[in-house]
UniProtKB/Swiss-Prot annotation:
Forms part of the ribosomal stalk, playing a central role in the interaction of the ribosome with GTP-bound translation factors. Disulfide bonds: none annotated. One of its GO terms (molecular function) is large ribosomal subunit rRNA binding. Belongs to the universal ribosomal protein uL10 family. This is Large ribosomal subunit protein uL10. Gene3D superfamilies: 3.30.70.1730, 6.10.250.290. Part of the ribosomal stalk of the 50S ribosomal subunit. The N-terminus interacts with L11 and the large rRNA to form the base of the stalk. The C-terminus forms an elongated spine to which L12 dimers bind in a sequential fashion forming a multimeric L10(L12)X complex. InterPro entries: Ribosomal_uL10, Ribosomal_uL10-like_sf, Ribosomal_uL10_bac, Ribosomal_uL10_bac_type, Ribosomal_uL10_CS_bac. It comes from the Bacteria. PROSITE patterns: RIBOSOMAL_L10 (PS01109).
């Protein structure tokens, strides 16, 4: 890779990392190409970007986008997105299915380096759409119970008449 190509890669990664709300770094040593493609497909469905990047290039891009502090060693695959929950859900689900070859190493979430435990905890949270559905269900419950009660009262009066 020439110096110009490296500069282009760093500039591209910088701009993408600046927009990313979450960046997760994982070890994928020993993962088959088929499994790696499955990860890429699952990530693509959630608008999560996946890329294997040299650590030196990733370090420069992270530092230039004000997201440094992660210690990067060995072979790494990077996943990032503007949606924190999407990244964590994809990564944790894939790690559970492929724990022998795929491990979460570190992450950058909410402006700070995050532990593996924080990534796993975040993945268990409901998404925005799920939270809205829960809220609507809570708001709808009293009205629904009221109408059920009125219908029961109506049927009782009809039977007694």
């Amino acid at each position: 890779m020439t110096r110009n190509e490296k500069s282009e890669v760093i500039a591209k990664l910088e701009s993408e990392f600046k927009d990313a709300q979450a960046i997760v770094v994982c070890d994928y040593h020993g993962l088959s190409v088929k499994k790696l493609e499955a990860l890429r497909n699952a990530a693509r469905e959630q608008n999560v970007k996946v890329q294997v990047i040299k650590n030196t290039l990733a370090n420069i891009a992270l530092k230039n986008s004000a997201k440094d502090g992660m210690s990067l060693k060995d072979t790494n695959i990077y996943l990032w997105s503007e949606d924190q929950l999407a990244v964590t859900k994809v990564v944790v689900k894939f790690e559970e299915a492929n724990s022998e070859f795929f491990k979460i190493k570190t992450a950058y979430i909410d402006g700070e380096v995050a532990s593996v435990d924080k990534v796993k905890a975040l993945s268990k949270m409901p998404s925005r759409d799920e939270l809205i559905a829960m809220l609507l269900q809570v708001w709808n419950a009293p009205i629904q119970n009221f109408t059920i009660g009125l219908n029961a009262l109506k049927e009782k009066k009809e039977q007694s008449a």
